[in-house]
Amino acid sequence: MNVECVVTGASSQIGGPLLELLPDRFFRVNAWSRKPQAEVRGVAWQRADLSEVYKIDETVTHLIHLAPLALLAPVLEHAHPMRVIAISTCSVRHKASSASPAERKLAEKLKNAEKQVIMMARRKGHQLTLLRPAMLYGAGRDGTVAVLQKLARRFGFLLVPGRALGLRQPVHVADVAQAIVGCIDHDKTIGRCYELGGRAQITLRQLAERVLTDNGKRARVYSVPSWLLRPVIDAARILKIRPDWDVGLLDRAQKNQTVDNRPAMRDFGYDPSPFNGKGLTRKVIRR
């Protein structure tokens, strides 16, 4: 059993299922968050804001970073050498060629954050693994599947931009938690970056249909011209209903955003679950 780990951003989507798994592998689990959550077996919560400088105790052997990646490099700079597993996102690649300048700028910021983390890890002797999940779902807090779930339950139908034939590969947060544990257990993942998708590659239209049927609704999905949805997305962002939305998603609805799971499957036995449109029923498996 490993000695001690720190989980930053522990109240994030992935934090819930991950904190259920870590006490089986560490004598002590420290969960850092600006908003500590309910007590979990074997987990000690600590209020922490990574925009400030925090010193990690010398007894900590592992750092699992779920907070925004841009906050990690300063933490690594002031820490002793550790095993580090950090969550990035496939948006680094998928939004790099977006029609939206804002999305391209975001992708560039994410890429720069990855570069800074990699350079700092090498400089300070940390053993780093980067994980890039695809479209997250399962905690009811994501910007795509959770939104579709709420709309499906309320209205019984969903609207998609155009034909919405771009492929997606939604990955459950519990599968990402299992991937983190897999990296802890397999040293061959050190120095690598893995993209993580779900088991299924489905079009955005099929995803909407699955959300409806898995929630007991008829598969009523209607195509709407993108130009009609553009003011809706702008309004949702301006009114802060969905501040993360951008009109670039209308263009990306027609493009594939998938990943290759084979490197993760080969190196640490990654085995994602089938897509579940309810999303909230995935059981965390202790291995």
Question: Where are the regions that the model predicts?
Answer:
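Active-site Tyr-X1-5-Lys
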Residues: 104-130, 139-147
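Mid/C-terminal beta-alpha module of Rossmann-like enzyme folds, strongest
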Residues: 186-245, 261-262, 266-287
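Substrate-positioning beta->alpha
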Residues: 142-147, 162-184, 191-195
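Conserved sequence/active-site signature of Rossmann-fold short-chain dehydrogenase/reductase
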Residues: 92, 136-138, 176
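Alpha-helical membrane-targeting segments
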Residues: 147-173, 218-257
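N-terminal Rossmann NAD(P)H-binding glycine-rich loop of SDR-like oxidoreductase domains
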Residues: 3-24
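N-terminal Rossmann-fold cofactor-binding loop
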Residues: 31-36
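NAD(P)H-binding glycine-rich loop region in Rossmannoid oxidoreductase-like domains
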Residues: 37-86, 90-101
